[in-house]
Amino acid sequence: MTAEIRLYITEGEVEDYRVFLERLEQSGLEWRPATPEDADAVIVLAGLWGTRRDEILGAVDLARKSSKPIITVRPYGLENVPPELEAVSSEVVGWNPHCIRDALEDALDVI
């Protein structure tokens, strides 16, 4: 992949955010941070749902209005995500760097 993807990633004061950034770097994906409005895709860290629900809902709403893919990442070590997130997600993935990259490439139709 040669194109740089603009990503909005939900942030928080939890370890999940730091670990996700490490996994994203390991994926080999070329990306840069963006606002929800300017992003090519929105990444929702489901582990932040309890503390950042309003922020997440705002980003999801913007993504849906703009027909941007929403990739939800399961809480670290868990299989389930909140049903509200699963219903609006383009894909739900775990923490494998290659799965994260593949989900983004598939959602954005990148070869």
From Swiss-Prot:
Gene3D superfamilies registered for this protein in UniProt: Hypothetical protein MTH538
Swiss-Prot/TrEMBL keywords: Magnesium
SUPFAM superfamilies: Hypothetical protein MTH538 (SSF52206)
Cofactor section: Mg(2+)
Subunit structure: Monomer.
Role of this protein: Not known. Could have a role in a phosphorylation-independent two-component response regulator system.
Protein name as annotated: Protein MTH_538
Organism, as annotated: Methanothermobacter thermautotrophicus (strain ATCC 29096 / DSM 1053 / JCM 10044 / NBRC 100330 / Delta H)
